[in-house]
């Protein structure tokens, strides 16, 4: 049966992370006639939140992300080209039966949601991150984050939105970029940047970025 492995993946994810699911939502994943908005509300919401503003930093905030980027990443998960642990643990099974139309609809749904952000907690750390974000670290070969992601972290037609993303998730992705060229095949620029940043610098940038509110 086509939906049994998917239901198993959902059940395992629920046990491991506290995400909840239902029999009906797992069935919907194998049905190409189900609209992406329905999948977003009944399936994706279990981990990412109904509005794409997840409360668990294991799962990224999707609200306000560029539609093109969400489409690209969902297709990378579906084709198993994205090899980071979160990819194969959670997204491979969930995305494998998605149609192109459903991916488009999911991306459009989350792209139009209002993004959130974390409240500032550590001014010293966040200010250090803000300086790197705005100016880079020329002596270490690190360009300003604004060059690609914009002054407010909103991204562009080539680079994703990072403003308001969970700090822990950002750190995790930096670690992925540092670890292997294969895990995130579309992140050539970030691989160079990540290798030139120290752990404390990554933590500072992540802390600042997580507090950038929507503009």
Describe each PLM feature range.
Residues 55-61, 77-121, 156-161, 180-212:
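Axial heme c-ligation environment in periplasmic c-type cytochrome domains
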Residues 1-8:
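Bacterial N-terminal signal peptides that target proteins for export
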Residues 37-41, 45, 134-146, 155-157, ...:
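Sequence context surrounding c-type heme c attachment/ligation sites in exported
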Residues 15-18:
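C-terminal motif of bacterial Sec signal peptides marking the signal peptidase cleavage site
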């Amino acid at each position: 049966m086509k939906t049994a492995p998917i239901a198993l993946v959902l059940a395992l994810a629920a046990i491991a992370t506290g995400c909840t699911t239902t029999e009906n939502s797992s069935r919907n994943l194998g049905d190409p006639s189900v609209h992406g908005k329905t999948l977003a509300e009944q399936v994706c919401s279990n981990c990412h939140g109904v509005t794409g503003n997840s409360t668990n930093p294991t799962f990224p905030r999707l609200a306000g992300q560029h539609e093109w980027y969400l489409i690209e990443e969902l297709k990378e998960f579906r084709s198993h080209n994205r090899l980071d642990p979160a990819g194969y643990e959670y997204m491979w099974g969930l995305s494998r039966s998605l149609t192109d139309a459903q991916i488009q609809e999911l991306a459009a749904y989350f792209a139009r949601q209002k993004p959130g952000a974390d409240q500032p907690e550590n001014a010293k750390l966040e200010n250090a991150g803000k300086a790197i974000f705005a100016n880079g670290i020329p002596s270490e070969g690190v360009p300003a984050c604004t060059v690609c992601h914009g002054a407010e972290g909103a991204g562009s037609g080539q680079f994703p939105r990072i403003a308001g993303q969970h700090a822990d998730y950002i750190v995790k992705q930096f670690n992925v970029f540092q670890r292997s060229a294969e895990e995130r095949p579309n992140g050539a620029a970030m691989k160079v940047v990540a290798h030139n940043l120290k752990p404390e610098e990554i933590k500072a940038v992540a802390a600042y970025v997580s507090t950038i509110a929507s503009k």
